[in-house]
A protein has these predicted regions:
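Conserved acidic-Pro-Pro-aromatic motif
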Residues: 1-99
Length: 99
């Protein structure tokens, strides 16, 4: 998802699909997304409720606090820290992803 700060709305609108299929979600994390504090809570709740974790493009698991710190440390002109994966912890995709 790269929808200019509306990624949490995109996830919310896809909850039926997420519940049925547990897809791997590619998301670009940016300052735009988390300029709304509600989005931080929404993502935390989503990760907990649907048993998803965040991974970087090097297949390393990240937590949301690390993401927020990384965004906070960006230079003023930079807005994003790139793409990350949201992967359901019990999915076959995770096994394949990490192997």
């Amino acid at each position: 998802l790269d929808i200019e700060g509306n990624e949490m709305s995109g996830i919310h609108g896809s909850l039926d699909l997420i519940e049925k299929s547990s897809p791997l979600i590619i998301i670009e994390f940016s300052k735009y997304i988390f300029s709304k504090k509600d989005n931080i809570e929404y993502l935390k709740n989503f990760l907990d409720r649907y048993d998803y974790s965040i991974y970087d493009t090097n297949n390393k698991r990240k937590n949301l606090d690390n993401i927020l710190i990384k965004l906070d440390n960006l230079k003023k002109r930079q807005q994003t820290i790139g793409n990350f994966y949201l992967i359901k912890n019990s999915s076959k995709i995770l096994e394949e992803f990490l192997s």
